[in-house]
Amino acid sequence: MSDYKSSLNLPATQFPMKANLANREGGFLKKWQNDGLYDQIRQQNQGKPKFVLHDGPPYANGDIHIGHTVNKVLKDMIVKSKSLSGFDAPYVPGWDCHGLPIEFNVEKKYGKVGVKIDASTFRSKCRKYADQQVLKQKQDFQRLGILSDWDNPYLTKDFQYESDIVRALGRIVKNGHVSKGYKPVHWCTECGSALAETEVEYKDNQSEAIDVKFRIIDDSVFNMNKPVSVVIWTTTPWTLPANEAVALHPELNYVLVDIGDEYLLLAQALVETSISRYGIEATIGEQTFSGSELEGLKIKHPFYDKQVPIILGEYVTIDAGTGAVHTAPAHGQEDFIVGLKYNLPVECLVDIKGVFFKETELLGGQFIFKANDSVIEILKQANTLVKHESLMHSYPHCWRHKTPVIFRATPQWFISMQKNGLIDTVNREISKVQWMPDWGKKRIELMMDSRPDWCISRQRFWGVPITLFVHKQTGELHPNTQALFVSIANRIEKEGIEAWFKSDAQDFIGNDANDYDKTTDILDVWFDSGVSHFTVLKARKELSNVADLYLEGADQHRGWFQLSLISSVAINGKAPYKNVLTHGFVVDKNGKKMSKSLGNVMSPQKIVNNLGADVLRLWIASTDYTSEMTVGDEILKRSADSYRRIRNTMRFMLANMQAFNPVEHLLDNKQMLDLDKWIVAKTANLQTQIIKAYEQYNFHHVVQLILNFCSNDLGGFYLDVIKDRQYTTQANSLARRSAQSALHHITEAMVRWLAPILSFTAEEIWQNMPSEKNTSIFLASWYQDLTFGYENKAIDITREISPFIRKQMEGMRGEKIIGSSLESEIDIYCETDIFSTLSQLDDELRFIFITSYIRIHSLNEKNDDCIKAIEGVFIKVSKSRHEKCVRCWHHREDVGNNAKHPELCGRCVENVDGKGEIRKFA
């Protein structure tokens, strides 16, 4: 038996089957960094249309988690796809570097300020800690394959950034949006500081719910012979010492309930449920009183010797309780607002740690939550407690300490939502922005509807100072405030925030220092990131004043999206972004939020070290990120399987372009075989869909299209069909060069499709492609040399028939009748139109079905052995009775006809010893 292996064009490539991503990806990272790839891209794309995705800064504390990974990879895919589309798409990463989490970590190591460490040294330690965290996170982000200006990120602790924060504050003050007020704000007793809305999260908490009687002093309006008390319901007993009124709804009806020795005043709509809760016998009166009729009545505090009024509040509801609301203006926002209307006192009895001041009657020195029991006992002794029970309900907690927060009235600095029409302008700007998904618009509108003034001051150490001087008598700002903002910002630009803290008032305002207080508060850390449109977008020449896109998690509607919008409108009168895109949270396979306590955390570092960054990126791209994103070992395994399918497809094509040089061998589309024209046109149409999906940030659709192409059009059809032609025709034949030309076009297109998602693998493919290339795939644009518009009815028909033929062959394999499909022969019986179409392929039809013989018959020739395939087509598959050609493995009648090559079929003889076979179709 002769060996004809040397006469075959066997595939060969240096692109390995085994990806070994975890080890191989690092080499590409190093090359990108050594080559200065990001700078090369910027230089190449200079002058092209700009697309700016502005990075919302993660907090510089701890390892990056899977949520960070999703966020950064989504951004990276957008930036890379925009670059492929011909945009100059710079990407500047950022980090949030001030704030409490860093303070707490430094405190753990060095102790509290004023106890074991001075404030200046403390801030220095915070700065150093932030540097360490940024470096660690940056390395992890880079390992994910994210191309960014890593050498020039924006850090909110940088002197330049800190000074620009002060300049931004100056602009907002100048525009009349900043005010000082004594108002109740969210307060964390652990932090000892005010919290912004964005720093509060809601979770279940057990509270003590109590119903309390306030004896009505002037009860003549009721004309009753027994005392009357209005009953309130509250879940914060500790706030009762600060009570200044009881609020009723003006339009609700209230009734008297006779309980024997007195009457209780309750909302008519809540009488039945209240009596049931109290477990008492009672008679409900028939006469009703509207809330507005009872306004101004004096009532007795339940345990202090003082009188408070009945007032009216539209916010009173009948969802729970009694329809009467205990009002403590120092400890509730609605209480405070209604208190302004009635000129109620705003007296805070609680210090920064949540302890009652010593002079507080009956409760001095007690921590508020522990004081609940004391308050309940005092009420019992005063005979004013109607009901007490524990209640599990949603309650605000500090997002850092996970402890309940309170409302506490303190002097704070605010950005007023009402002054100078800020909220109205914000709402107008919301409608100009494209929100994706579209529910984002409604969500932020609802948040703005109930948006309180933004408390921007904090009573901490590590942050940008509120650089204001306030007159000791009048409370007015210094008349040279704007000039002071300029000079102070210039000093901070050179020396950092220490320039403010180490100086006294005289250093800035000279002799006026005797009349003015130098503010000691620092800015809310959300202000730092919220003004990044001013400090980064506007400040960096490679960016633009308004970002094309902000992309963050769904929680940022109440965070960075909202506060960036407010600050931008306060400074510039317009939104800082044109489009806002939201992604969902990552949950485990059971839909549960990831947490260390549940033991369900998926570490991106472990995934990358095990499977490689590209598999993790593929999972992100494959998932509909607009809702919750589910991840687990099994899901990642499926992503790894999908990755292998793509890699194997690309490897097959690279291997079959062996000895192909596009400069010498690339055929014009008109010269190519019909099947090759068809697959190139298919690729062209698919590229149009893929680019559109990228433009819509619809990455999971991109992945679906690519996988379907690999599995069906390529792996399930075209690549199988061309194997015979690739391996057996002469090396430089038109048939082989045609297929290689098609593979060249497909690979050139696909490597670009893959680049935003499988960045490392795309670069590896690029380096193994047989042509002169730029140094990196990321310097390329979408492939432009695909030919559209070719259709072929014969191919469409064969693809419809093919599954039925394969099924027949599988059955025959199962019965051991045949092994390879080349051991079979096929008879097709079809109606006239199909007969005519398929007949045009002549003997080449067998290559489409990968069989040794195909015979086409008229439909009326079919017999009972035939199986229906499609309408108008029947098939019969049988075992070939002919000898096998040792070179192409086809079973052909002419095997043995050539004396020189008795083991070869006729066409193999022609390919080995003749001019080579001629192919036109497949």
Curated annotation (Swiss-Prot):
The family database entries (InterPro entries) matched by this protein are listed as: aa-tRNA-synth_I_CS (IPR001412), aa-tRNA-synth_Ia (IPR002300), Anticodon_Ile_BEm (IPR033708), Ile-tRNA-ligase (IPR002301), Ile-tRNA-ligase_type1 (IPR023585), Ile-tRNA_ligase (IPR050081), M/V/L/I-tRNA-synth_anticd-bd (IPR013155), Rossmann-like_a/b/a_fold (IPR014729)
UniProt binding sites for Zn(2+): C885, C888, C905, C908
Q: Name one GO biological process term.
A: isoleucyl-tRNA aminoacylation
> Required co-factor?
Zn(2+)
Motif 'HIGH' region is found at: 58-68
Q: Which CDD domains match?
A: Anticodon_Ia_Ile_BEm, IleRS_core
Q: What is the name of the protein in this document?
A: Isoleucine--tRNA ligase
Write down the PROSITE patterns for this protein, in alphabetical order. AA_TRNA_LIGASE_I
- Which NCBIfam families does this UniProt record tie to the protein? ileS
- Binding positions for L-isoleucyl-5'-AMP? E552
Q: Which keywords does the record carry?
A: Aminoacyl-tRNA synthetase, ATP-binding, Cytoplasm, Ligase, Metal-binding, Nucleotide-binding, Protein biosynthesis, Zinc
Q: Where does ATP bind?
A: K596
EC number(s) per UniProt?
6.1.1.5
- Give the catalysed reaction(s), semicolon-separated: tRNA(Ile) + L-isoleucine + ATP = L-isoleucyl-tRNA(Ile) + AMP + diphosphate
Q: What does this protein do?
A: Catalyzes the attachment of isoleucine to tRNA(Ile). As IleRS can inadvertently accommodate and process structurally similar amino acids such as valine, to avoid such errors it has two additional distinct tRNA(Ile)-dependent editing activities. One activity is designated as 'pretransfer' editing and involves the hydrolysis of activated Val-AMP. The other activity is designated 'posttransfer' editing and involves deacylation of mischarged Val-tRNA(Ile).
Task: Write out the GO MF terms.
Answer: aminoacyl-tRNA deacylase activity; ATP binding; isoleucine-tRNA ligase activity; tRNA binding; zinc ion binding
Where found?
Cytoplasm
Cofactor detail note: Binds 1 zinc ion per subunit.
- Species this protein is from: Ruthia magnifica subsp. Calyptogena magnifica
